Amino acid sequence: MSDDKGKAPKRTEDESSGKDGKKIPPQLATLLLDQNPALKQELANMDKDQAAALLHNMDLSQMLTGLSMGGKNQKDMASYKFWQTQPVPAFNDAANKQIEQGPIKIIDPEKVSQTPGALIDGFEWCTLDLTNAEELKELYELLNNHYVEDDNAMFRFSYSESFLHWALMSPGWKKEWHVGVRATKSRKLVASICGVPTELRVRGERIKVTEINFLCIHKKLRSKRLTPVLIKEITRRCYVNGIYQAIYTGGVILPTPVSSCRYYHRALDWLKLYEVGFSPLPHGSTKARMITKNHLPTETLTPGLRPMEVKDIDAVYDLLERYMRRFDMNQAFTREEIDHWLVYKEQPDKEQVVWSYVVEDPETHKITDFVSFYNLSSTVIDHPKHEAVRAAYLYYYASETAFSDDQKAFKERLQLLMNDALICAKKAHFDVFNALTSHDNPLFLEQLKFGAGDGQLHFYLYNYRAAPIAGGINQKNLPDESKMGGVGIVML
């Protein structure tokens, strides 16, 4: 296939037929392969007859492996062949109306390898010690130089050392789940994959899972096929500790999302977002008009709103637990996790990562509402004026009004609470406030002038099968109040 490397293999038949007699027109096959570099590369590495046979036996859903609605692709992560070997739901499972919820594969602890798999020559496994400032800095530098960028290489997530400490050292964290790969000679950290333990509720079933994050590979090693090896190694380490399920997210379509949400963005400093290329100037509008449109009051409006303190942990824990149970897939918090994830404890050498606020009823002193957001900035690549976009991400929230039968009152309360969160974020010098269509967010996104993003976030369960869960969007990919009640977890 040397002459056709990277192109869809030619066929003598009029169409490439998929399984079960489904036909994939050659034009569609070519289009899908053009948007799917992982599968394209796999076909390019085969001889012509092998590639034609594989394509002939694939159905349309299988060809979607590795596609992203936003055009973003992680070639290695999206490997069709790799995901065929993993205990994840197949695309066509979604067509089965009677999906039996539960583990896909029962793991025999006796058969779990106690040693890591082989790595390519010149590289070796390591376990990161994030209590060691030098190793934490190494992970910070790897992520800041080689982690997620947007399509146009204008922005890259910028994880601070404080953020990594917060995200990876939650209650019950395990050092061995902070996995790295080093170059044997230089000792340089060139890849990572990390996990933290948590507990999910999926339609009432409690599952101990590992939350997988920070899969990152040095740009110069992207062709080395390290991603499947990293995933297998973190899986092995979780199995050794008796955890057989995981949750992870991504912008790429893999087999098979349990849910998908859409990103929405609310400008806090519209002019800066325009200058860095994040926000466009709508046709027929002006800069002055857009600044006015996105203006916020200087003071919050909810009586009794104040920063959350340690003394509020029990009340927030009770409120949040009741609120979260309303969703098909949610995080089952412990009191210790509420303390870790939501309470900011000021330290002179660490920047603030999370902002949490409670509403204390002025008369009863009961906590009636709670809202939080966290800081995840993005580096602006090669910009003459701005170095970073300071982004607030909506985190967890809850309100007692959710438990009444008055949906209108709940909607109004949520809009008031979220508008105050925007004001608090603006006061804390954030440039943009991001939120998904998860939780009850469709009740306020459009009303509070959030704009639709071009990114989707797909949620995946590893070694666990569940019927599809609503992500707050309809078939037109717009927020829909009738599609709420599904996703109730926030992944960092």
Regions found by a protein language model. Name each.
Residues 85, 104, 145, 212, ...:
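Hydrophobic transmembrane signal anchors and adjacent membrane-proximal interface regions, especially
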Residues 217-260, 268-269, 285, 299-311, ...:
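A structural/positional concept
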Residues 130, 134, 225, 329, ...:
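Residue-level detector of secondary-structure boundary/capping sites
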Residues 137, 141-144, 228, 232, ...:
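A broad, structural surface signal
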Residues 214-236, 404-423:
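Conserved acetyl-CoA-binding loop-helix of GNAT-fold acetyltransferases
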Residues 83, 88, 112-114, 119-219, ...:
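A conserved beta-strand-loop-helix scaffold within acyl/acetyltransferase catalytic domains
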Residues 2-33, 37-46, 52-58, 65-91, ...:
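Active-site/acyl-donor-binding loops of N-acyltransferases
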Residues 94-97, 191, 242:
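Conserved ATPase active-site switch/coordination loops adjacent to the nucleotide-binding site
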